Structures are given as structure tokens and as C-alpha cells.
From Swiss-Prot:
Protein name: Large ribosomal subunit protein uL23
Keyword RNA-binding: yes
Chain's role: Binds to 23S rRNA. One of the proteins that surrounds the polypeptide exit tunnel on the outside of the ribosome.
Gene designation per UniProt: rpl23
Organism: Staphylothermus marinus (strain ATCC 43588 / DSM 3639 / JCM 9404 / F1)
The keyword Ribosomal protein is annotated on this UniProt entry: yes
Length: 91
């Protein structure tokens, strides 16, 4: 594992387990994570692709009122967000 890969593994802090996040899994094939606040969208995309072995179409981010960075990660149609969510114990 290269130094860069090691950094990517530290970007994803935890999955979000809210009603909205669970609805996005089914309706939009999108996973929601709390990520490192300094991570760019490209970093988040690379981290999700490396850790879960999926293709990412789009990443949207926001800073929550608690000061955490939340990332909405839309997966390519050939990958199911519900499969990743079940591996993570979300559903």
C-alpha cells in the first residue's frame, strides 16, 4: 500500500445512518458518509472507489451545523448502493 492509499483510507470517517440517507440508498443509488473536513471531492471519490471497489459518478458535499463534512456519493448504475449499505450494516 502506498502512502497515498493509506491517506485515502483515513478520509471516510463513518457512514450516516439517518432516514434521509437510507431513502437516498434506494431512490438515488447514493451513499452518505461523514468524511475528513480537509478532503476534496476527488479525494472522497478516490477513497470510496478504493475502499468499496465501486465506480463513483458524482460527489456532493456540505458542512453540517456540527462542523462535520458530509458527502453524498452517487454510484454508477452497475453498482448497488444497497449492497454496500448492507455490508456496512446500515440495512
Amino acid at each position: 500500500m502506498s502512502m497515498d492509499e493509506g491517506r485515502l483510507y483515513k478520509i471516510i470517517i463513518r457512514p450516516v445512518h439517518s432516514e434521509k440517507a437510507l431513502n437516498l440508498i434506494d431512490k438515488e443509488n447514493t451513499l452518505t458518509f461523514i468524511v475528513d473536513r480537509n478532503a476534496s471531492k476527488k479525494d472522497i471519490k478516490d477513497a470510496v472507489e478504493l475502499v468499496f471497489g465501486v465506480k463513483v459518478l458524482k460527489v456532493r458535499t456540505l458542512i453540517t451545523s456540527r462542523g462535520e463534512k458530509k458527502a453524498y456519493v452517487k454510484l454508477a448504475p452497475e453498482h448497488r448502493a444497497s449492497e454496500i449499505a448492507s455490508q456496512l450494516g446500515l440495512i
